Curated annotation (Swiss-Prot):
Gene responsible for this protein: ATG11
Cellular localisation: Cytoplasmic vesicle, Autophagosome
Disulphide-bridged cysteine pairs: none
Compositionally biased spans, kind Polar residues: 754-767, 784-793
One BP term from GO: autophagy
Domain of life: Eukaryota
Protein keywords: Autophagy, Coiled coil, Cytoplasmic vesicle, Phosphoprotein, Protein transport, Stress response, Transport
GO cellular component, as recorded: autophagosome; cytoplasmic vesicle; plasmodesma
Biased composition, class Basic and acidic residues, residue ranges: 699-710
Residue positions where Phosphothreonine is found in the record: 851
Entry-linked InterPro entries: ATG11, Atg11_C, ATG17-like_dom, Ubiquitin-like_domsf
Organism: Arabidopsis thaliana
Protein name stated in the entry: Autophagy-related protein 11
Length: 1148
């Protein structure tokens, strides 16, 4: 640990601590595992800020005492910790004391002038030589004075730099505190903006509900419900709500709406005031600038450099004059430099010193002094600014926190407003909900049609798979059956056949209302939705975006377009092909109905949410752009599909025209043949009449077949009448198309309609029997509407035969015609037998229909069971809903209790943190307990009561502890006084013991070494004790006033750290002296007496040096050092050390 400041702090394991109130900085040696509390204790030891008053900030983080430094990423070389004094942040705290810089002035630091010191050259006869030591003393004085000024200047400049550094630290501390406040304010202000956004949304919704309540009531009254849903108590949509209770609810809502609006206005004004204060606080920080001060301090370094150069010059001059003096003293003056020349050269140097160097250094010193005063003023201004600024930050933080605490209250109020407007929202939501329900009925009906159609498609595919398997088994038995006995094949199970696959869809949605998409606008007009203008402008866009799931290719409508009907999990990747008994147009219409109904329902549910949503202009533009793109895509797909349908219709019309043209040609040819036969054969009129009747019959049959085919194409059954059970017989489409015309083949591929059974049978007979008669071929042409090659050749042959009737006998022709008529009759009988077989198949289908009817009844029973299960599930859901409501009410009560307890704890925390001492803490607790006791409420919960009791008990205990603490302090003071007195007594006792011990040791020494305590003689051993006057006096029973000489005292004490309490030695000399009277003392104060005394002292020294053992006597003395009375006799004893001196000496 150290208390020095480093400008570039980059050492690992060190934490830079900066005190904000005065700018002082300290380094703390620590590691990542050091606790923050240890850092705070160090700060308390070096700065005097109490542990409870410290607030530590690093960047935007507050350091918690119970955490480690690693939790905040400390220590780090590029981060510092700022220490704020909470006591100085209070509004009633005293202002900072002025900055005091205690420095020694130049006049006090100057050495005394040594102008009158004697020098050997002062007695020289030559005035020039006599002047040299004077110049030396003056130059040396100039040098010392300059060095003093320079040192004082450097110290003051260092103080200027220190003050500048401290101001920079305070500036960074202000920035950190400002960023911390700015971050806190930004979070609270963002919460305020989000709250105001939600409030404005709610306010617009509630205002619209209140303003348009009458219009909503009239809408519901004018909207008649569906006749099937009407009862005696329900005729219109208004009957869905209780109209009598609504008027009172509207009044309550209007009053609450106005009150809440006023409260929000006050809350908004509070935030305006908070914003103004924060902006004012941030604006006053702009006056905090350190650049000019740093530049000024840096610029004043030139004065130090200037003084340094002057000091070099003064030092050089001092060395010069000293060398001259030394040369004159040693008589080494050269002939070229005489003393007079040296003196004449030193004169101008003295003038430069006196008039240039020293005044310039004094001017530099004055400039640095002014800079120091300026820095002190700036530092005082900075201290006052930081003090006031931090108090403002504390105040602004308090009002921001006060505003923050109001957010939960207003959020709860918004929830209560929503609950209060629930009835009005119910009135507004009846119309859209009713329209959405009707649209949902239409969507479900369309979905059911598509679902049943796909079931038929699945049954058809499975039947085709079964027929393929049956053919494979028959071919296998036909190939291998003749070689293996039948019973073996039967035992192997090879005679089994696949069973029929029944795709059964149980009836559902049988109770749906019988309405179509057009009935939705009829029974629930669009004005019931009450779309806002913004919704109305985007309605078409949203509708088109909802329909954008249509495929762009009209001929390949994938099953994935029915994802909202959940068909993708059945045939997710397959293509929607034709469904038996339906047409592609009906499939498309059903899907479009479902999409339209779904869009209507979605708009009805989206309207109340989207109507008052606050959208930015960019979001509105994005929504409009996306809707426009999807609308353009949908319109393009519609145009392409329309073109495709027109091409298909044109192609079908061309086919129909070609068929009609060929039929007319065939009729004309038959008529021509008949007329030619009538001209050449007038004998057999009856045969010709029979032939005419048969031709007419075939024409009628052909025309009826054509009409039947057209009816089959245009008049297919509706999708909801399609049978749900399909039992299809085997078909051979490849054989049915073999003898058809190319145009008809193409048409059959497009329309995918089954051929008539008579046409298939006729075609098969033509393939098996070879060539048929002319009338049979023409019958095949009329029934099939096709132009095969073999019938065309027959017609050509018939025409050629008609042309040759003139040359042949008419009887042969009639006979041939009769044979052909007989063959046709046989064919008719075969057709009758086949018709009987078809009737049997119809009876089989009837039996299967009865079986399916039974399955249908079972399905209805299953549906009834499912309805019962659904009813039970609804009851269980209602139970869960009630439980959830109960839990919600409990949560609301707990939340209110928690908010109340939080308020109580805030009051408790403010009371705890308010006072700075124990007494203030006890008073604040007593005040809080009294305030809580005065605010007793009957409806408060047990938690609040327990909290009040705890606070009261805590206040009592704290008061007791405070009083007990005062008593303990008083006792401690008394104990300290007693302890001090005891310590003094102990010291006295110790001194007494030491004295007694010394005497005891002296007694032992005297007994041991025979110390003389009577008349002292040379060669005897004497003991001297240190008296109170600081002299060593001999222990003597008979004659006192034996004192130890100064030489002996120096001999015994120079090598010791302190003077011993006693000295024992062998006497080598005794000098007797008498204290003179005052008159004699004044008479002897002459120079001769002084010289005589000096000579006597020298004689005594020589006597001591030669270890004289004689006793000398002097009758006079010049002084009275031992404080004896006049005329008193005393003896100065000189002693020598004994062999073992360590035994006889002991330090005090």
């Amino acid at each position: 640990m150290s208390g020095s400041f480093t400008e570039s702090f980059a050492d690992d394991g060190k934490l830079l601590l900066c005190v904000a109130e005065n700018g002082h900085s300290f380094e703390f040696q620590c590691s990542e595992t050091t606790s923050v509390e240890s850092v705070m204790r160090f700060v308390e030891s070096v700065s005097g800020i109490a542990l409870s008053d410290q607030l530590l900030l690093s960047l935007d983080m507050k350091l918690e005492p119970q955490k480690l430094l690693s939790a905040f990423g400390l220590p780090a070389s590029d981060r510092e910790v700022f220490v704020f004094n909470k006591a100085m942040l209070q509004s009633n705290s005293h202002p900072p004391s002025p900055e005091d810089v205690d420095l020694q002035d130049v006049a006090d630091a100057l050495p005394p002038a040594s102008l009158h010191e004697h020098h050997p050259l002062d007695d020289a006869s030559d005035p020039a030589l006599k002047a040299l030591p004077l110049y030396e003393r003056q130059f040396r004085y100039h040098f010392h004075k300059g060095r003093t000024i320079y040192n004082c200047t450097v110290v003051k400049h260092e103080n200027c730099e220190r003050l500048t550094r401290e101001q920079k630290v305070q500036q960074r501390a202000v920035e950190v505190a400002t960023r911390n406040l700015e971050q806190y304010y930004r979070v609270i202000y963002q919460n305020f903006l989000e709250f105001m956004k939600r409030y404005k949304h709610q306010h617009r919704l509630h205002s619209d509900l209140l303003m348009n309540f009458g219009r909503d009531i009239e809408k519901l009254r004018s909207a008649k419900i569906h006749p099937y849903l009407q009862t005696e108590s329900r005729k219109c949509l208004l009957d869905f709500v209780k109209e009598d209770n609504l008027k009172k609810a509207v009044e309550n809502c209007a009053s609450s709406h106005r009150q809440f609006e006023n409260k929000i206005a006050q809350f908004q004004q509070m935030f305006v005031e908070v914003k103004r204060k924060v902006e004012e606080l941030f604006a006053c920080r702009a006056s905090l600038s350190m650049k000019n001060l740093e530049v000024t301090v840096k610029d004043h370094e030139r004065f130090i450099d200037e003084e340094k150069s002057i000091m070099q010059s003064l030092s050089k001059d001092v060395n010069t004059v000293k060398k001259l003096v030394d040369d004159c003293m040693s008589s080494q003056v050269s002939s070229s430099l005489r003393p007079h020349d040296a003196v004449s050269a030193l004169g101008p140097m003295y003038e430069v010193h006196d008039k240039n160097h020293l005044p310039k250094m004094q001017a530099c010193y004055n400039s640095i002094s002014e800079l120091l005063d300026f820095c002190k003023n700036k530092k005082n201004e900075m201290n006052n600014f930081v003090h006031g600024y931090m108090q403002k930050i504390t105040y602004v933080t308090y009002i921001i926190k006060d505003a923050k605490l109001q957010f939960p209250v207003f959020r709860e109020a918004m929830v209560r407003q929503d609950d209060l407007f629930a009835d009005l929202k119910l009135v507004r939501g009846v119309g859209p909900a009713y329209r959405a329900c009707l649209a949902e009925v239409v969507r479900r009906k369309a979905s059911m049609k598509l679902y049943m159609g796909m079931a038929g498609q699945l049954a058809e595919k499975l039947a085709m798979k079964r027929e393929t398997e049956v053919r494979k088994r028959e071919e296998f038995l036909k190939t291998h059956g003749p070689f293996v006995p039948r019973d073996v094949l039967a035992s192997m199970g090879l005679y089994d056949t696949p069973t029929q696959c029944d795709v059964n869809v149980a009836p559902y949605d049988t109770s749906l209302l019988n309405i179509e998409i057009s009935d939705v606008d009829r029974y629930a007009p669009e004005f019931l939705v009450g779309l806002h203008s913004k919704i109305a402008s985007l309605k078409s866009s949203l509708t088109m975006s909802g329909d954008s799931s249509l495929s762009a290719e009209p001929e390949e409508i994938g099953i994935d377009t029915f994802d909202k009907d959940n068909f993708d999990d059945i045939l997710a990747a397959s293509e929607l092909i034709e469904i038996a008994g339906t047409s592609k147009m009906e499939v498309e219409n059903a899907k479009l109905k479902a999409d339209l109904a779904s869009a209507i329902s979605r708009i009805c549910s989206l309207g109340p949410q989207f109507e008052y949503e606050v959208l930015d202009e960019s979001e509105v533009e994005n929504v409009l752009k996306n809707a426009a793109d999807k609308t353009a895509e949908a319109l393009q797909a519609k145009d392409e599909y329309e073109k495709h349908l027109l091409l298909m219709l044109k192609e079908k019309q061309m086919h129909c025209d070609s068929y009609e043209k060929r039929i007319r040609e065939l009729e004309q040819r038959l008529s021509d043949e008949y007329l030619q036969g009538q001209r050449h054969n007038n004998k057999d009129v009856s045969g010709l009449n029979l032939m005419h009747e048969k031709v007419s019959e075939y024409k009628a049959e052909a025309s009826s077949d054509v009409e039947g085919n057209k009816t089959h194409v245009s008049g297919s059954e509706p999708m909801d009448e399609v049978s749900c059970v399909s039992n299809l017989t085997s078909k051979q489409p490849c054989k049915a198309r073999e003898g058809m015309d190319e145009n008809m083949v193409d048409s059959s591929q497009v329309l995918s309609q089954p051929l008539d059974s008579s046409m298939l049978e006729s075609q098969q007979n033509n393939e098996k029997g070879g060539k048929d008669s002319e009338a049979g071929e023409m019958g095949v042409f009329l029934s099939n509407s096709s132009t095969a090659e073999s019938p065309q050749k027959s017609l050509d042959d018939n025409v050629a035969t008609g042309r040759g009737l003139d040359a042949k006998d008419s009887g042969d022709i009639i006979l041939e015609l009769r044979n052909e008529l007989m063959e046709k009759s046989n064919k008719l009988s075969e057709m009758e037998s086949k018709l009987n077989g078809a009737m049997e198949e119809v009876s089989n289908l009837s039996r299967e229909l009865e079986t399916n009817q039974k399955l249908l009844e079972e399905s209805q029973m299953n549906c009834a069971h499912l309805e019962n299960c659904l009813h039970e599930a609804r009851e269980e859901a209602q139970t869960h809903l009630c439980a959830a409501d109960r839990r919600a009410s409990q949560y609301t009560a707990l939340r209110a209790s928690a908010v109340k307890m939080r308020g109580l704890f805030e009051r408790f925390r403010s009371s705890v943190c308010a006072g700075s001492g124990i007494a203030d803490f006890a008073d604040s607790l007593r005040t809080l307990a009294q305030a809580l006791a005065n605010s007793v409420n009957e409806n408060e919960d047990d938690g609040t009561t327990e909290f009040r009791k705890c606070i009261r008990v805590l206040a009592d205990k704290v008061s007791f502890l405070s009083k007990h603490r005062e008593e303990l302090l008083e006792k401690c003071q008394n104990l300290e006084a007693t302890s001090e007195q005891t310590r003094k007594d102990l010291e006295e006792k110790k001194e007494l013991v030491k004295t007694l011990y010394t005497k005891h040791q002296l007694g032992k020494q005297a007994n041991k070494e025979k110390i003389s305590f009577g008349r002292l003689e040379v060669h005897e051993i004497a003991a001297f004790v240190l008296n109170q006057a600081g002299h060593y006096e001999a222990i003597n029973r008979n004659c006192p006033n034996y004192y130890l000489s100064s030489e002996s005292e120096a001999l015994f004490t120079d090598h010791l750290p302190s003077r011993p309490t006693y000295i024992v030695g062998q006497i080598v000399h005794i000098e007797r002296q008498i204290v003179k009277l005052p008159s004699q003392l004044s008479a002897s104060a002459s120079p001769e007496a002084g010289k005589t005394h000096h000579l006597c002292s020298d004689q005594g020294s020589r006597t001591l040096a030669s270890s004289s053992i004689s006793t000398s006597t002097s009758a006079t003395t010049t002084s009275n050092p031992y404080g004896l009375s006049s005329g008193c006799e005393y003896f100065i004893v000189t002693i020598a050390m004994l062999p073992d001196t360590a035994i006889h000496q002991q330090a005090s």
